[in-house]
Amino acid sequence: MNASTEFDTGPLSWVKNEIDLALERAANALNAYAESADLSHIQYCRTHLHQVQGALIIVGLDGVRQLTEALEALLEAMETGTVAANRANIALTYQGLQGIGSYLDALLAGQN
């Protein structure tokens, strides 16, 4: 990385545990929805994902923030019935949550 693209991992390291916790809670809410089909779990997932988005804004990770916005929009569409809250969309959301966590882990490990 050169100086113009180097990412300062300090701020991310300060909030990473909170991000991980919010991602875990979001995933747990998705799992709860898969077991019960109670749409309130989709709302809980969206709430936790919104917390992740806020932390990403603070640390300046706009690309990942855009992914959280897209996932949040998908969750909202599932919640309102605009998009089916089916296995495929739940799996897609779950993969997105895992991808966010993996990407942030890689950033902290010095990978880009």
What do the predicted segments below correspond to?
Residues 1-9, 82-112:
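Structural secondary-structure packing elements that flank or coincide with functional cores
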Residues 17-20, 24, 43, 50, ...:
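Generic structural signal for well-ordered, non-transmembrane alpha-helical segments
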Residues 41-45, 58-74, 88-96:
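Short, well-ordered alpha-helical segments
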Residues 3-48:
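Long, amphipathic alpha-helical coiled-coil segments characteristic
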